[in-house]
Amino acid sequence: MNGTLHAAMDSSCDIVATLRFFIKSGLYRRSHNLFQVAVHKRTKLTLGRGFTVEGKASLHLGDDGGHYPRHTASSLRVGDGAKLILEGNHRILSGHQMDIGPGAEIRFGGGYINHDARISCQHRLTIGRGTIIGEDACIMDSDSHVLVGSAAPRGIEIGEHVWVGGRVMILKNSFLHDGVVVAAGAVVSGEFPPGSLIAGVPARVVRENVEWR
């Protein structure tokens, strides 16, 4: 048994679900690593046709790690023709509900999303390298319905080394530049400059040139 397989079987990985994703996404055509996208137990998959995975980094879905394991169910729904781009190793902990709509694109630069996240990507979502997202976050790049005469949504871009606190909501057309810190409970809509601390409903810049580690 090779090291990759042994490591996966020692974890909470669901081998059958992982194999299903590996085949359905077409990863088997270009990757020798069955566990590049590791689907953990209690994660429900709904997979459309013709969706693809790009990049060589890894993704863990429904991982029950972290300081306070919850053992809660997760789900991933991927629409027809959607694209998942893995530019850095990423973990999404258990309890997440993630919906990637038909033809949508979601890009992970490498980071961490805590338990019970709600992610709806109907257009485009980018999460940069080294970004961490707190518990119970909600990220939606669409309102599901559209006001007559309004501009089409542009998606959401979250830069590198961004810290998003717990129970934050990030709405369509938001752009968080590198190093932004989002206080817990904020509702984010719009563009925010690098190194800013934002808070409130709606979120506003409350401090500039902050650093975190």
List the predicted regions and their residue ranges.
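Domain-scale signature associated with acetyltransferase and cell-envelope carbohydrate enzymes
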Residues: M1-I139, G159-H161, D178, P194, ...
